[in-house]
């Protein structure tokens, strides 16, 4: 097996989450899944913690 070098999507779960639309991700929860991240504020402007 090849060593994990961090370049594969599976090695970067946090980054891979950003590739999944919150609406399509069954694990998405606006509070527990990092609603306040800049990416989610761009995609989900209704998040209460995002600037208007």
Swiss-Prot record:
Signal peptide: 1
Keywords noted in UniProt: Amidation, Cleavage on pair of basic residues, Disulfide bond, Hydroxylation, Secreted, Signal, Toxin
MF (Gene Ontology): toxin activity
Subcellular location: Secreted
Disulfide bridge partners, by residue number: 35-49, 36-47, 41-50
UniProt modified residues of type 4-hydroxyproline: 38, 48, 51
Expressed in which tissues: Expressed by the venom duct.
Domain comment as written in the entry: The cysteine framework is III (CC-C-C-CC).
Name of the featured protein: Conotoxin reg3h
